[in-house]
């Protein structure tokens, strides 16, 4: 069965830590793909906000 896990953080280091923690629980042969995205925008108060996201596609066996 294919599954996905989605991560979304404001800091890239937090994203890295969370992804590495998740991947440490998987067999590396079960990871199909990792999609990565960065978005930046300005809030109504003028603050620059970054969004670092990743989606891991992986296989589990039942």
Where are these regions (language model features)?
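C-terminal edge-of-domain segments
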Residues: 48-62
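Short proline/glycine-enriched turn/loop segments at secondary-structure junctions
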Residues: 42-47
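Conserved short hydrophobic interaction patches
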Residues: 22-25
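Short, mixed-charge low-complexity intrinsically disordered segments
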Residues: 28-36, 40
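Surface-exposed ligand/attachment interfaces on beta-rich extracellular proteins
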Residues: 15
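Short amphipathic
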Residues: 1-10
């Amino acid at each position: 069965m294919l599954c996905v896990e989605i991560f979304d953080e404001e800091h890239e280091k937090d994203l890295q830590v969370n992804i590495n923690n998740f991947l440490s629980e998987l067999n590396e042969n079960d990871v199909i793909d990792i999609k990565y995205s960065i978005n930046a925008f300005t809030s109504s108060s003028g603050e620059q906000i970054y969004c670092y996201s990743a989606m891991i596609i992986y296989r589990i066996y039942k």
